[in-house]
Amino acid sequence: MHPRQLKNDHLFIIPKSIIKLLAEMEKQYEDNNRQYFENLLNHQNYIIRTRAVCILADLAGEESVKYLSKVLEKDANALVRHEAAFSLGQLGFSTAISSLSRAVESDQSFFVRHEAAIALGVIGSSKARTTLKGALVDSSEEVRQSALVALANLKYISTMKRKNKFTTMTGG
């Protein structure tokens, strides 16, 4: 056995049904079928929901904010919520600030709180400043650091009086 191989690697085999569904998702993506991906946000498998979040953000733009915000607030899986926060940040619409702020303030996963803080910084609105300052005392060092990264970006945007591609590349 290779030293990095898990003893129970048979438990991590991806079912053929998931691979088949990913192929169907690719077809639906090529057809720009937003409704299909909106429906997949409720799929039982987190792998599918994670992909659906990213694809819906790409296909629907600002119209996806309401769906991604719901995922951020309600999905049971932290990875899916993290991807929703990331996608909302990349989209950059101020309509996502409320749900991202709630995630920073109360999500049970530091992983999600961290990404939501970064996303607020990417969006670049001063409306997020209070939430980000509150995150400076979060129990998680990663969240505190992410809040500082986001606050630095807000300060840079206000100093330069512009938002551009550079200001969306905060890392995190």
Specify the residue positions occupied by each region the protein language model found.
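Amphipathic alpha-helical scaffolding segments comprising HEAT/armadillo-like alpha-solenoid repeats
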Residues: M1-D9, K27-N42, G61-K74, F93-S106, ...
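Alpha-helix N-cap/helix-start positions at coil->helix boundaries
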Residues: F12-P15, Y46-I47, E62, N77-L79, ...
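Conserved hydrophobic register position within alpha-solenoid helical repeats
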Residues: I18-L21, A52, A84, A116, ...
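Alpha-helical segment of the N-proximal tetratricopeptide repeat
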Residues: I19-K27, Y36-N42, Y46-L59
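Core register positions within helices of long alpha-helical scaffolds
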Residues: E24-K27, I55, S87, A119, ...
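Acidic (E/D-rich), amphipathic helical modules within compact regulatory domains
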Residues: Y46, R51-I55, E63-K70, K74-Q90
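Short, solvent-exposed interaction modules
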Residues: S106-V112, A117, V122
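Solenoidal tandem-repeat scaffolds enriched in leucines and small polar residues
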Residues: V143-Q145, V149
